[in-house]
């Protein structure tokens, strides 16, 4: 995937809330609730800037030559909308594009939910999940694939450092992906 594809993917994000809102009127109550939650977060949430930081490959899962071939510094950028719901938990809708371990652009469009602990006005932490669509050059040749991963965060006011664990086996997965989020 080249930079042009990344720009097209990021531009198309603006259409997601419109499509979600149009699809919210179904006969399935759980789909309606999920759709309304995503649409409401997008329309009423605060603006967020996402900055990918680091991709750490767990050393037990790879040999040294493979580790040496990876680029673990992750460049990229993202935009999202997020809010704290009535229960005090964080919800966000985002699009982020970043360099994968082989320096290819990897876009990711998703929804995240975290159950928060601690006062929002100070230091607080969260654990939850993200459901997303992504594409990678080395997996299905950039055909979008869905996924669900665990996430955790450490937050101070509108700043957060987040991580997600990508499970895998010997020679694949077993990755901790770190990014920051700044609300404005």
Curated annotation (Swiss-Prot):
InterPro entries from the UniProt entry: LipidA_acyl_PagP (IPR009746), OMP/PagP_b-brl (IPR011250)
Keywords associated with the record: Acyltransferase, Cell outer membrane, Membrane, Signal, Transferase
Entry's Gene Ontology cellular component terms: cell outer membrane
GO biological process: lipid A biosynthetic process
Entry's EC annotation: 2.3.1.251
Major localization class: membrane
Keyword RNA-binding on entry: no
SUPFAM superfamilies: OMPA-like
Site entry (Role in lipopolysaccharide recognition), positions: 66
UniProt enzyme class: transferase
Subunit structure: Homodimer.
Purpose: Transfers a fatty acid residue from the sn-1 position of a phospholipid to the N-linked hydroxyfatty acid chain on the proximal unit of lipid A or its precursors.
UniProt name for this protein: Lipid A acyltransferase PagP
């Amino acid at each position: 995937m080249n930079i042009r594809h990344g720009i097209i993917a990021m531009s198309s994000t603006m259409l997601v809330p419109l499509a979600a809102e149009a699809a919210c009127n179904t006969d399935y109550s759980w789909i309606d609730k999920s759709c309304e939650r995503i649409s409401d977060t997008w329309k009423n949430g605060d603006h967020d800037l996402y900055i990918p930081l680091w991709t750490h490959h767990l050393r037990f899962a790879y040999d040294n030559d493979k580790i040496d071939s990876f680029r673990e510094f992750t460049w990229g950028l993202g935009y999202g909308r997020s809010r704290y719901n009535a229960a005090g938990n964080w919800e966000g809708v985002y699009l982020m594009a970043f360099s994968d371990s082989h320096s290819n652009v990897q876009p990711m469009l998703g929804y995240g939910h975290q159950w928060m602990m601690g006062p929002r006005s100070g230091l607080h932490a969260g654990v939850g999940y993200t459901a997303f669509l992504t594409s990678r050059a080395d997996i299905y040749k950039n055909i979008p694939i869905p996924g669900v991963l665990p996430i955790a965060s450490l937050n101070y006011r509108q700043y957060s450092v987040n991580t997600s664990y990508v499970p895998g086996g010997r020679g694949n997965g077993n990755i901790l992906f770190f990014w920051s989020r700044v609300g404005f």
